[in-house]
A protein has these predicted regions:
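Short, charge-rich amphipathic segments
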Residues: 1-8, 43-50, 77-80, 104-110
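Short solvent-exposed beta->alpha transition segments
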Residues: 32, 36, 47-90
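Surface-exposed, charged secondary-structure patches
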Residues: 67-118, 127-131
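Short, low-complexity N-terminal intrinsically disordered segments enriched in polar/charged residues
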Residues: 1-43
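Extended aliphatic helical segments
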Residues: 7, 16, 38, 50, ...
Length: 131
């Protein structure tokens, strides 16, 4: 061990890869994030919607795009608070958590996708969609 390595001096955290977490640990982290996305999408709260996004994702999801989505998508504003966990896919340094999502206004089911990984030592959202 090199004592000059900043990891051993607390200056930065050792590299963490989310795929090393168990399904239960990933699910425990993912479900509150998904619930917040559903709630904030329904309420059209852009600032709250993006608060757990990675830096790159937050930049890509600008306020104009999100505002248009919230204003013009009946689905995005009427997501059911009830969803079913379907599974986890691990790839590289990210996991994709899949959900069966329903609407309070439209019949049918949609596939919810939440991509998670670490950024600056915290679990962040790197992708989220419903299709």
């Amino acid at each position: 061990m090199d004592s000059t390595n900043p990891v051993f001096h607390g200056l930065r955290e050792p590299h963490v890869n989310i795929i090393e977490k168990t399904d239960e640990e990933i699910r425990a982290a993912a479900e509150p994030l998904w619930r917040d996305l559903v709630k904030n999408s329904n309420e059209g709260k852009y600032g709250e919607f993006v608060k757990n996004f990675s830096g790159v994702m937050a930049l890509a999801m600008n306020q104009v795009t999100a505002g248009h989505q919230f204003a013009n998508s009946e689905l995005a504003r009427n997501l059911s608070e009830h969803f079913d966990y379907l599974g986890i896919i691990r790839r590289g340094e990210h996991v994709t958590v899949l959900y069966r999502q329903r609407s309070t206004k439209k019949d049918g089911e949609w596939l919810g996708r939440l991509v998670l990984g670490y950024e600056d030592g915290k679990i962040r959202i790197f992708g989220a969609s419903i299709f």
